[in-house]
Amino acid sequence: MQTFYIFFSHKRNVTNKEIPYVIVFLLATFCYVFFGFLCGRMNVNGFLNSLTLFLLISLPLCKKSFGEAVLNSFATLFSLLVGLSLLSWIINQTIGLPQLGTLELVGQHRSYLHYPFFVIEMADYAAVDILRFSGPFDEPGVVGTYGALILAISRFNFKDWRMVIILIAGIFSFSLFFYIVSFVYLLFYYVVVKKKVIASIFLLASLFAFYLGTKDNPIFYEYIWKRTEWNDESKTIEGDNRSNDSVDAYLKRIRGTSEYYIGTSDDNWYNTVAGGGSATYKSIICINGIIFFVLYVGFFILLGTSNKKTKSEAILYCIVVLANFYQRSSIYFPVTVFLYCAFAMDYFLYSNRMKKSLRIVQS
């Protein structure tokens, strides 16, 4: 509530072009709250608490200068946190560090080895993915997801020391999402947006050289190249673990019913799909209904297409955001919502040197 109050205190007047996506957001949130109460996903207290979600509309409606200040503070904190964690992780990989104990993720039956500033997930008392950097987060995908988003917002500006740290962290996370989004963004940006042929050729040549240099490396093959191989049985790449047969079967079974449109109760979902399925957009449709899902995703699409200066930049924004929805389909998470808004509205990520230059110009 305090965060939303701060954003509201820096709000600006809504323009005519913003009215459509404001309405879509309010409709999506109304459907989320009303359908949730109707289907038993929330009780009276949950219903009342969920009303605060309407306040998230303050994130894209704040003054641009304030939004940029928040974005830069977040990027600095994220890069410092990840950088400190990465340094500790590298030391542990080379000479070793003492364990500080174990941590339990309540409700998800997940355990972690705790080291200074980072964790490594455990399974059956053994480390899992010890070579993948997850920092202080519950899985490496968090580093890859937020790292790719921040880099995309900055347009991969490696003159900014924070982006260099985030790039290195993303590489060591071995997040397939990070690798794919980074390459697709850079290729689309240089070919379509900037129309720089030489830069595009250099990028493709660099990727090819990277592939030749790492394809026979067991670590890179296991974590990257093997996961890009096509699986004829699942009809997707090996690294696509965003769904499973039980989720697909459930979605197919409810198609055309009221559950498909407005969702179902959490108990029914978890009892029908073992473990609640997986981190996929299909789970959002099954739980909250297709009506809410279309409105919620539609809000971010409208936000980007209404604010991006060119059609090609809007398409690039949509590619990154939709890919993120596919990879990490959280809804109403304030950090993710804010980063989408910052990306859509071209909030400027400036380094300390650039910030000083701006002050000189303004003075």
Segment roles from a protein language model:
Residues 219-289:
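Long extracytoplasmic/lumenal interhelical loops at the membrane interface
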Residues 2-13, 147-156, 163, 290-308:
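Hydrophobic, aromatic-rich transmembrane alpha-helices
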Residues 2-58, 320-323:
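N-terminal hydrophobic segments of proteins, predominantly signal-anchor/transmembrane helices
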Residues 75-95, 120-174, 180-191:
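Alpha-helical transmembrane segments of multi-pass inner-membrane proteins
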Residues 186-189, 196-200, 287-325:
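Hydrophobic transmembrane alpha-helices and their immediate junctions
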Residues 32, 36, 44-45, 312-353:
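Membrane helix-loop boundary segments at the extracytoplasmic
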Residues 87-92, 191-233, 254-256:
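A membrane-periplasm/extracellular boundary helix in multi-pass inner-membrane enzymes
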Residues 37-91, 296-302:
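Transmembrane alpha-helical segments and their membrane-water interfaces
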